[in-house]
């Protein structure tokens, strides 16, 4: 489905859920997210927002006549830097999630000889599933209370839920120690629908968006083999039947 990586309003799975949720009825959803063949439970929530900083334009040769909005970003950057000093790990249902709060984009400047009259910084907060989207938003609004905030995207996290019978069966079939999902995935949407979901697929997520991003060809075969092995087990059909879904 389209638009999985951008703002929630464009997400194709969300549109299906809104228009024909019956098409998504299932006992277990397996999201083929890159996990390098390891089951990853739940997912982080994500919040993207901008903060606006005002200044006053002036010629850079007479900078004292203006107010540099770029320089006035410093307190925000200091908050972000200070935040990195605390322990970002949060334990949820036995899985150790790591939160992140980072500046990802800056917009400022008019010309090379003009003091910037305004600046906008975009920040991405990746939060653990021990909190709701509303709680995450409140935390950010309190942390950056001194600046006008515009929320661009806010998506709920999902708790691991690996104690569900089919999920437990799949973890056992894969045979590796499950871990947390660093990032937001559509397990959150299935969670909202009351459907157990987990992440499992080829490709090492630690290479995502890096210059050397790649996927081992063998990882495709290993993932397929794990899925086939699990689906061939008799108890999978039995557990699915006990799920009570049509």
Provide a role label for each language-model segment.
Residues 1-44:
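Acidic/histidine-rich catalytic neighborhood of metal-dependent amide-processing enzymes
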Residues 34, 41, 48-246:
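Metal-dependent amide/peptide-bond hydrolase catalytic core
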């Amino acid at each position: 489905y389209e638009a999985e990586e951008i703002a929630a309003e464009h997400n194709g799975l969300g549109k299906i859920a809104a228009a024909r949720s019956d098409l998504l009825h299932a006992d277990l959803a397996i999201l083929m997210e890159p996990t390098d063949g390891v089951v990853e439970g739940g997912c982080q929530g994500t919040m993207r927002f901008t903060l606006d900083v005002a200044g006053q334009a002036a010629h850079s040769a007479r900078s004292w006549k203006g107010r540099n909005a770029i320089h006035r970003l410093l307190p925000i950057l200091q908050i972000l830097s200070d935040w990195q000093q605390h322990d970002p790990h949060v334990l949820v249902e036995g899985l150790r999630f790591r939160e992140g709060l980072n500046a990802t984009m800056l917009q400022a400047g008019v010309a090379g000889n003009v003091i910037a009259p305004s600046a906008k910084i975009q920040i991405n907060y990746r939060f653990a599933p021990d909190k709701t989207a509303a709680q995450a938003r409140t935390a950010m609004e309190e942390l950056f209370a001194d600046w006008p905030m515009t929320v661009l995207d806010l998506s709920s996290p999902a708790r691991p839920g690996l104690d569900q019978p089919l999920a437990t069966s799949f973890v056992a079939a894969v045979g590796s120690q499950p871990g947390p999902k660093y990032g937001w995935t559509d397990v959150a949407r299935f969670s909202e629908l009351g459907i157990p979901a987990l992440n499992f697929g080829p490709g090492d997520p630690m290479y995502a968006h890096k210059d050397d991003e790649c996927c081992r060809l063998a990882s495709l075969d290993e993932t397929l083999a794990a899925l086939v092995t699990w689906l061939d087990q008799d108890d999978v059909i039995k557990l699915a039947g006990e799920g009570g879904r049509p």
